[in-house]
């Protein structure tokens, strides 16, 4: 069974820092991996989608890497801003199902 783990569970950093959020999964048989953000009281917003054949994706200040063989994905956030404060979730698509991590709650302090 696929299990997805995210560390750290919570992170508080000063504005301007570069951040690293980690996601690990137990089964390398994945179709794709997706990073989302969730703002309080709102639904999920898709940030980056990495197909299993790809190594990374970039969008603005965000970069996500995927190492399927070691079961890891990393989300890098450059020059963090207070508006980046949210819960970040990693989801792996395996066996026609989505498996979500428990998320990392990020607070960026101005």
Residue ranges and their predicted role:
Residues 1-110:
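Extracellular domains of the immunoglobulin superfamily
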């Amino acid at each position: 069974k696929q299990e997805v783990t995210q560390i750290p569970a919570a992170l508080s950093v000063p504005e301007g820092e570069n951040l690293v959020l980690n996601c690990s999964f137990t089964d390398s048989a994945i179709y794709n991996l997706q990073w989302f953000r969730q703002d309080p009281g709102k639904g999920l917003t898709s940030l980056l989608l990495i197909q299993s054949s790809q190594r990374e994706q970039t969008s603005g200040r965000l970069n996500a890497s995927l190492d399927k063989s070691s079961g890891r994905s990393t989300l890098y956030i450059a020059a963090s801003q207070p508006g980046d404060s949210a819960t970040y979730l990693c989801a792996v698509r395996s066996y026609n199902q989505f498996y979500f991590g428990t998320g990392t709650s990020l607070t960026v302090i101005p």
